[in-house]
Amino acid sequence: MPQLDTSTWYTTILLMILAIFCIFQLKMIKHLYMNVPLILNQELFIKHQTPWHSKWTKIYLPPSLLLQS
């Protein structure tokens, strides 16, 4: 049974990877990316401080009646 000639496999695989890379690059060039929207009014994006944001509050639960018996 004759042996399989693998001497050209390295070249074939290398050229295939190069071709896939080139095709991918050509597809990416044609792709249209969205532009980043310009922020026209910065005041719309400022978080408004409310009184409870600056204070630490904790809600206490009433004692359970079951635990007292």
Curated annotation (Swiss-Prot):
What is the residue range of the signal peptide feature? none
Please give, as recorded in its UniProt entry, the membrane topology of this protein.
Answer: Single-pass membrane protein
Q: Subcellular localization, per the record?
A: Mitochondrion membrane
Q: Which GO terms describe its cellular component?
A: mitochondrial membrane; proton-transporting ATP synthase complex
Q: Which InterPro entries match?
A: ATP8_mammal (IPR039017), ATP8_metazoa (IPR001421)
Q: Which UniProt keywords apply?
A: Acetylation, ATP synthesis, CF(0), Hydrogen ion transport, Ion transport, Membrane, Mitochondrion, Transmembrane, Transmembrane helix, Transport
Membrane-spanning parts: 8-24
The record's section on Pfam families has: ATP-synt_8
A Gene Ontology biological process noted in the UniProt record is: proton motive force-driven ATP synthesis
Q: Which residues carry this modification: N6-succinyllysine?
A: 55
Query: To which protein family does this belong?
Result: Belongs to the ATPase protein 8 family.
Self-association or partners: how does it assemble? Component of the ATP synthase complex composed at least of ATP5F1A/subunit alpha, ATP5F1B/subunit beta, ATP5MC1/subunit c (homooctomer), MT-ATP6/subunit a, MT-ATP8/subunit 8, ATP5ME/subunit e, ATP5MF/subunit f, ATP5MG/subunit g, ATP5MK/subunit k, ATP5MJ/subunit j, ATP5F1C/subunit gamma, ATP5F1D/subunit delta, ATP5F1E/subunit epsilon, ATP5PF/subunit F6, ATP5PB/subunit b, ATP5PD/subunit d, ATP5PO/subunit OSCP.
Protein name per its UniProtKB record: ATP synthase F(0) complex subunit 8
Gene field = MT-ATP8
